[in-house]
């Protein structure tokens, strides 16, 4: 089940808000300028290829492209067996921002987006069928956990794909990690 925790950015001991209600997650995030929605499930084979995944969600992807000017979409998958999983996790764990929206639709699996908005940190557990769109310039980081298991559709306006501008803020090192929050759930 997806969830949202909201913390003061100087105190991660207890969330100010915790909810697993999809409508409440959407409401809280939309009020903060973050798009969050649930898409209908598509039946996909276990070994679905990136092309078959994009074809299954073509209507939704094309709608997002038209609404937001995205030029490309791709599919990224990570499993616990990936030889570079630790490097990838470390790369995404530092607070950064982008010059374009970061859009992810979870086809399967899960991951945590941490959104540093003013004096709060919104921690969003995204799972299968969740779409999150983090506006350009938003300070954030992502934790896939020590044993990542996810497949996501990504959309870009920049043909170079994922390009981060790291903030240098150490806040991400103070926040609870994936394994701690998933264990609590």
Swiss-Prot record:
InterPro entries for this protein: ARD, ARD_bac, RmlC-like_jellyroll, RmlC_Cupin_sf
- Disulfide bridge map: none
- Which residues participate in Ni(2+) binding? 96, 98, 102, 140
Catalysed reactions, as listed in the record: 1,2-dihydroxy-5-(methylsulfanyl)pent-1-en-3-one + O2 = 3-(methylsulfanyl)propanoate + CO + formate + 2 H(+); 1,2-dihydroxy-5-(methylsulfanyl)pent-1-en-3-one + O2 = 4-methylsulfanyl-2-oxobutanoate + formate + 2 H(+)
Q: Which GO terms describe its molecular function?
A: acireductone dioxygenase (Ni2+-requiring) activity; acireductone dioxygenase [iron(II)-requiring] activity; iron ion binding; nickel cation binding
Keyword list (alphabetical) reads: Amino-acid biosynthesis, Dioxygenase, Iron, Metal-binding, Methionine biosynthesis, Nickel, Oxidoreductase
Question: Could you confirm whether the keyword Transcription regulation appears in this record?
Answer: no
On the tree of life, the source organism's domain of life is Bacteria
Q: In which pathway does it act?
A: Amino-acid biosynthesis; L-methionine biosynthesis via salvage pathway; L-methionine from S-methyl-5-thio-alpha-D-ribose 1-phosphate: step 5/6
Cofactor binding description: Binds 1 Fe(2+) cation per monomer.
| Biological-process GO terms, alphabetical | L-methionine salvage from methylthioadenosine; L-methionine salvage from S-adenosylmethionine
- Where along the sequence does the record put site: May play a role in transmitting local conformational changes? 101
| UniProt-annotated binding residues for Fe(2+) | 96, 98, 102, 140
* Protein EC: 1.13.11.54, 1.13.11.53
Annotated site (Important to generate the dianion), which positions? 104
Sum up the protein's function in the record's words.
Catalyzes 2 different reactions between oxygen and the acireductone 1,2-dihydroxy-3-keto-5-methylthiopentene (DHK-MTPene) depending upon the metal bound in the active site. Fe-containing acireductone dioxygenase (Fe-ARD) produces formate and 2-keto-4-methylthiobutyrate (KMTB), the alpha-ketoacid precursor of methionine in the methionine recycle pathway. Ni-containing acireductone dioxygenase (Ni-ARD) produces methylthiopropionate, carbon monoxide and formate, and does not lie on the methionine recycle pathway.
- Known partners and oligomeric status: Monomer.
* PANTHER family tied to this protein: ACIREDUCTONE DIOXYGENASE (PTHR23418:SF0)
In the record, the note on similarity to other proteins reads:
Belongs to the acireductone dioxygenase (ARD) family.
Q: HAMAP family given for it?
A: Salvage_MtnD
The protein in question is named Acireductone dioxygenase
Q: Which organism is it from?
A: Hahella chejuensis (strain KCTC 2396)
């Amino acid at each position: 089940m997806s969830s949202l925790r909201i913390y003061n950015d100087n105190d991660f001991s207890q969330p100010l808000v915790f909810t697993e209600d999809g409508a409440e997650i959407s409401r809280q995030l939309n009020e903060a300028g973050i798009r969050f929605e649930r898409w209908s499930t598509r039946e996909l084979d276990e070994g679905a290829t990136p092309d078959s995944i994009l074809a299954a969600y073509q209507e939704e992807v094309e709608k997002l492209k038209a609404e937001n000017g995205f030029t490309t979409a791709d599919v990224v998958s990570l499993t616990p067996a990936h030889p570079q999983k630790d490097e990838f996790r470390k790369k995404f764990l530092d607070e950064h921002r982008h010059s374009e929206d970061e859009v992810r639709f979870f086809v399967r699996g899960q991951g945590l987006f941490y959104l540093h908005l003013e004096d709060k940190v919104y921690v969003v557990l995204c799972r299968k069928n969740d779409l999150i769109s983090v506006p350009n310039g938003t300070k954030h980081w992502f934790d896939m956990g020590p044993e990542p298991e996810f497949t996501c559709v990504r959309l870009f306006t920049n043909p170079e794909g994922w390009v981060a501008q790291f903030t240098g803020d150490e806040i991400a090192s103070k926040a609870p990690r994936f394994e701690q929050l998933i264990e609590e759930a």
